[in-house]
A protein has these predicted regions:
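Short membrane-interface loop/juxtamembrane segments of multi-pass integral membrane proteins
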Residues: 41-55, 121-139
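Hydrophobic alpha-helical membrane-embedded segments
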Residues: 7-31, 97-113
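Interfacial loop at the N-terminal end of multi-pass membrane proteins
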Residues: 16-58
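Juxtamembrane non-transmembrane "cap" segments at the membrane-aqueous interface
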Residues: 106-126
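Juxtamembrane boundary at the C-terminal end of a transmembrane helix
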Residues: 155-164
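C-terminal halves and exits of single transmembrane alpha-helices
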Residues: 98-110, 132-151
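Core segments of transmembrane alpha-helices
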Residues: 59-79, 140-154
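Interfacial segments of alpha-helical transmembrane regions
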Residues: 9, 83-100
Length: 164
């Protein structure tokens, strides 16, 4: 039953990601333009929808809030809630949680929400669609698989120092 719990925790992290995205685009998708290609960002600046400074600030805030928040979430789930001890127990749980979130990001956010709805459309940039190109998708899938495994291994190794 532990695997079911860990999958549910991954879904919880995916829901947090969706909430963060929904908050980010609540006043229009330009609020999350830092996640778009440089071409879309340039167009938004040219159209005076935003400034380079706002894009940089939003990207920094996104990273400063989300990365530590996601790390805290997975560590609390794996070590405080699930009671993982040792490298392997921590690693597999971290990997499953992050992988489930990654799948939700790829399919629910990228493919469906960004690719098939107008919620992420920025007026004046429609000719630059698809916003997530095949090349972008390949990078995201590569990072989402290899990257999540590396992050899980690093976090599990660090946590071995603190949790016995």
């Amino acid at each position: 039953m532990m695997i079911l719990q860990v999958i549910l925790e991954g879904i919880g992290l995916g829901v947090l990601l969706v909430i963060v995205c929904a908050i980010g685009i609540r006043k229009g998708a330009v609020g999350m333009v830092h996640l778009y290609s440089p071409e879309v960002q340039d167009r938004c600046v040219t159209l005076r929808l935003t400034t380079r400074e706002k894009i940089k600030r939003n990207a920094l805030v996104f990273k400063a809030v989300c990365v530590p928040g996601y790390i805290a979430y997975v560590l609390v789930c794996v070590y405080a809630v699930n009671g993982a001890r040792g490298f392997l127990a921590g690693f597999w749980q971290l990997l499953v949680i992050l992988s489930v979130m990654n799948l939700m990001d790829r399919f629910l956010v990228d493919d469906y929400w960004v690719g098939h709805t107008n919620a992420w459309t920025i007026p004046g940039t429609e000719d630059l669609k698809p916003y997530i190109t095949t090349k972008d998708k390949v990078k995201k899938w590569l990072f989402g698989t290899v990257g999540m495994a590396v992050i899980s291994a690093v976090l599990a190794a660090i946590m071995m120092i603190f949790v016995r």
